[in-house]
């Protein structure tokens, strides 16, 4: 009986340690994984080069493509911009969800070509597919 109790105690300790060391997803990553196209009211894309600014609304098909790309992001795609380092973006997208607006804009920082704000934090996003998509719909030419 004592050996069975010791075995149970050992198993509980191992499981507890495993749970403590488990990597928790960043809040923003959970948000991007849970996002659905039907949650989004509109997606506006904009760019500003020189003195000309353009603003257009994405089609349902392009919105679905954007959501698919956002759903694929991983924790490694995000780096917290805790010092609020950045510049003035020249292009980006704005998602309207339940009356709130979420921007994904150009970034000039090495940790990511895009940046966003979520959960009172600024985040750099490093994902080539998403960056290419945003540049494409914003009609950015390098």
Give each language-model segment a name.
Residues 1-18:
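Sec-dependent bacterial lipoprotein signal peptides
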């Amino acid at each position: 009986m004592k050996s069975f109790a010791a075995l149970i105690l050992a198993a509980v300790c191992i499981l507890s340690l495993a749970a403590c060391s488990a990597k928790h997803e960043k809040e923003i990553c959970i948000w991007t994984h849970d996002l659905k196209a039907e949650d989004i009211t509109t997606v506006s894309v904009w760019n500003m080069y020189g003195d000309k600014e353009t603003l257009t609304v994405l089609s349902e098909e392009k919105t679905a493509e954007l959501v698919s790309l956002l759903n694929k992001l991983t924790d490694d795609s995000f780096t917290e911009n805790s010092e609020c380092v950045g510049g003035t973006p020249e292009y980006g997208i704005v998602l309207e969800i339940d009356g709130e607006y979420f921007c994904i804009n150009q970034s000039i920082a090495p940790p990511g070509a895009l940046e966003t704000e979520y959960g009172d934090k600024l985040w750099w996003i490093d994902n080539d597919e998403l960056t290419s998509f945003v540049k494409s719909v914003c009609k950015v030419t390098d």
